[in-house]
Amino acid sequence: MAADGKNVLIMAGGTGGHVFPALACAREFQARGYSVHWLGTPRGIENELVPQAGLPLHLIQVSGLRGKGKLSLLKAPFTLIKAVLQARRIIRQLKPVCVLGFGGYVTGPGGVAARLCGVPLVIHEQNARAGTANRLLVPLSARVCEAFPNTFEASDKRRTTGNPVRPELFMDAQRAPLAERRARLLVLGGSLGAEPLNKLLPKALSEVPAGLRPEVFHQAGKQHAPITAERYHEAGVAAQVEPFIKDMAQAYGWADMVVCRAGALTVSELAAAGLPSMLVPLPHAIDDHQTHNAQYLAREGAAFLMPQATTGAAQLAERLNEVLMQPEKLNVMAGTARRLAKPAATSTVVDICLEVAHG
């Protein structure tokens, strides 16, 4: 444990969308001489990623309430009280100078416990529409960080910081001019794949004239990669299909444009990499937050928002033809995306935490 006044507690759990930006901030805290501890839950991805990062992980018992049965709802108040008490015990033991929450089920009880212990609480919202826990914690927070403008109501607590993303994504890729080569299309569905995109892209690309058709690199997910490769073969479209892309910075550096979902980190990474995109938001995302994320890039002209319900192969092919026949349009979109990036997001969030911690 670090010396008094040098501990920080980060709360993030459940999915990579919460955990990865929190890990970026953890590394920044460590670079400034702070000892970082992590508060999570037993079932989230943090149980794999946080120990890999060499950070101590503290667990509390809490889970979501959406879609649960009546018995779970009746037990909920007692479960939450127990989780708050568990978090309070951990905070009292660690004596952190501040608590930084990134969302997930752990953030609610942890945020309440921070307030009960008199430790400054800072929350960070990755999506353009705030999650339930972060919305409820605003009154208890010393500062409220948002990745996208106007996610929270205007107040002296609010700071628009952007999403912490990997610094290597901000490197300028050296690409030959599009006039001298075929365009390159990167298709992403998340680490598990997005089956609607896996079905849509081969059909859409088969409707693009062969002379205009881009090179294709498609992340299809472990379970769907073989059938996706077969779909491309049957459609007569050459494509490299992989279950998972380990080096996203390299993939972004290769691509000229991207077709993908609109998770908060993906949208922020597209801006960091300066990549035009066609965004197909996950239609059943909680509070439709992916559509709101996509609108951030689409409103400024850095992306096309293409709702899944109204986007078939013909519609996607038409959009692809439009940009492939106008390489200068891709260049303009790329520049717009890069201007929307927030390269200082990680250091800004950490600055805010230390400001409230030390005055």
Swiss-Prot record:
It comes from the Bacteria. One of its GO terms (biological process) is carbohydrate metabolic process. InterPro entries: GlcNAc_MurG, Glyco_trans_28_C, GlycoTrans_28_N. Its EC number is 2.4.1.227. Pathway: Cell wall biogenesis; peptidoglycan biosynthesis. The keyword Lyase does not apply. Pfam families: Glyco_tran_28_C (PF04101), Glyco_transf_28 (PF03033). Gene3D superfamilies: Glycogen Phosphorylase B. GO terms for cellular component: plasma membrane. It is found in: Cell inner membrane. It catalyses: di-trans,octa-cis-undecaprenyl diphospho-N-acetyl-alpha-D-muramoyl-L-alanyl-D-glutamyl-meso-2,6-diaminopimeloyl-D-alanyl-D-alanine + UDP-N-acetyl-alpha-D-glucosamine = di-trans,octa-cis-undecaprenyl diphospho-[N-acetyl-alpha-D-glucosaminyl-(1->4)]-N-acetyl-alpha-D-muramoyl-L-alanyl-D-glutamyl-meso-2,6-diaminopimeloyl-D-alanyl-D-alanine + UDP + H(+). Keywords: Cell cycle, Cell division, Cell inner membrane, Cell membrane, Cell shape, Cell wall biogenesis/degradation, Glycosyltransferase, Membrane, Peptidoglycan synthesis, Transferase. It is a peripheral membrane protein. GO terms for molecular function: UDP-N-acetyl-D-glucosamine:N-acetylmuramoyl-L-alanyl-D-glutamyl-meso-2,6-diaminopimelyl-D-alanyl-D-alanine-diphosphoundecaprenol 4-beta-N-acetylglucosaminlytransferase activity; undecaprenyldiphospho-muramoylpentapeptide beta-N-acetylglucosaminyltransferase activity. Its main location: membrane. It is an enzyme of class 2 (transferase). UDP-N-acetyl-alpha-D-glucosamine binds at residues 15-17, 127, 166, 191, 245, 264-269, 290. Belongs to the glycosyltransferase 28 family. MurG subfamily. PANTHER family: GLYCOSYLTRANSFERASE, UDP-N-ACETYLGLUCOSAMINE--N-ACETYLMURAMYL-(PENTAPEPTIDE) PYROPHOSPHORYL-UNDECAPRENOL N-ACETYLGLUCOSAMINE TRANSFERASE 1. Cell wall formation. Catalyzes the transfer of a GlcNAc subunit on undecaprenyl-pyrophosphoryl-MurNAc-pentapeptide (lipid intermediate I) to form undecaprenyl-pyrophosphoryl-MurNAc-(pentapeptide)GlcNAc (lipid intermediate II). HAMAP family: MurG. This is UDP-N-acetylglucosamine--N-acetylmuramyl-(pentapeptide) pyrophosphoryl-undecaprenol N-acetylglucosamine transferase.
